[in-house]
Every structure is written in structure tokens, then in C-alpha cells.
């Protein structure tokens, strides 16, 4: 994927969603067609491929049985998006410090399960009785699709290769 320089100080949620959509589309188009530069509506230039025989034909190269396709991403593209921070996804050039747990019981948060606590306000009031959500930080290893913050169904990439190889 190639990208032109963007104003990194003005990254909005829409531009980041568009960036992630571009990454996903590059992975989908990767094995189908010869390279051709195309410009997306938000101004980012990406490299996509034209359909070979049929638009419905799917190439199986790069897809392992029972897993997801591996997507190659140029490191420079992620460097340009470095200032974006998301509470849900971390794009990093560094490998995680530890592998994901093999079983849920290995996860410390599962061992120390806490129920939601009731909040109390002064006086008699019915607002804010329960916490909206509990923060949970753990590895997800078995997801192939998810729902984004706007409620759209998205594909979860199994692996992203960084660099020129």
C-alpha cells in the first residue's frame, strides 16, 4: 500500500475509519488483480488491482485452510498514522511482550472476576445505578468478524505483514 503525505495533526475518526477500510480493501483485492494506483475519496492514494476474469472470482493464493489471508502493509503507511490512538486497536511496529493465553483460565482477569458495582448518589435518585461497561484488556484469538464503533460489521485481519517483504 502506498500513501501520500497527510496532515497528521488533523486525523479525525472518519479519516481513521477510511484508513482501516483502505487496509481491509487492499487485503481483499491483493490476490485478485494487477496493480493500478487509485485515489480514494479522502485523498489517500492506495495501490489496488483490477479484476482478472470475473468480479465474483476469488483467488486462493495466500489463504491457509481454516485461517484468514495474510495482508502485507508498508511500514511507512503505519508511521504516517502513528499519532492516532484508539481504545480498541493498537497499530504497533513492536511485537507484544507476551503471547496470547492459550486458555481463558490463564488470563488474570478471568481468575479475578468481579461483578458490576452499584453506584450510589447522595439522596434518593435512580440515575447511574450501574456502570455502563467494565474495562477489559485481553487477547482475542478466535475472531474473524467484529462490529465497529458505528455498528458496522467488519472483517478482523488474522495477520498483517509489515515491511517490504
UniProtKB/Swiss-Prot annotation:
Any single GO CC term annotated in Swiss-Prot or TrEMBL for this entry: synaptic vesicle
MF term (GO), any: growth factor activity
Maturation propeptide residues: 4-119
Superkingdom as given in the UniProt entry: Eukaryota
Entry keyword set: Cleavage on pair of basic residues, Glycoprotein, Growth factor, Secreted, Signal
UniProt subcellular location: Secreted
PANTHER family attached to this UniProt entry: NERVE GROWTH FACTOR NGF -RELATED, NEUROTROPHIN-3
Name recorded for this polypeptide: Neurotrophin-3
The species this protein was found in: Aspidites melanocephalus (Black-headed python)
Lineage: Eukaryota, Metazoa, Chordata, Craniata, Vertebrata
Amino acid at each position: 500500500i502506498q500513501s501520500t503525505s497527510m496532515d497528521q495533526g488533523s486525523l479525525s475518526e472518519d479519516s481513521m475509519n477510511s484508513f482501516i477500510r483502505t487496509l481491509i480493501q487492499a487485503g481483499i483485492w491483493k490476490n485478485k488483480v494487477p496493480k493500478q494506483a487509485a485515489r480514494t475519496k479522502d485523498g489517500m492514494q492506495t495501490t489496488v488491482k483490477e479484476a482478472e476474469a470475473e468480479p465474483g472470482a476469488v483467488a486462493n493464493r495466500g489463504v491457509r485452510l481454516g485461517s484468514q489471508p495474510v495482508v502485507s502493509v508498508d511500514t511507512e503507511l503505519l508511521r504516517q498514522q502513528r499519532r492516532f490512538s484508539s481504545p480498541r486497536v493498537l497499530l504497533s511496529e513492536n511485537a507484544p511482550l507476551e503471547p496470547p493465553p492459550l486458555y481463558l483460565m490463564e488470563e488474570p482477569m478471568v481468575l479475578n472476576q468481579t461483578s458490576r458495582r452499584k453506584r450510589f448518589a447522595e439522596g434518593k435518585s435512580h440515575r447511574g445505578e450501574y456502570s455502563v461497561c467494565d474495562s477489559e484488556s485481553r487477547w482475542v484469538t478466535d475472531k474473524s468478524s467484529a462490529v465497529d464503533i458505528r455498528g458496522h460489521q467488519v472483517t478482523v485481519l488474522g495477520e498483517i505483514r509489515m515491511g517490504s517483504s
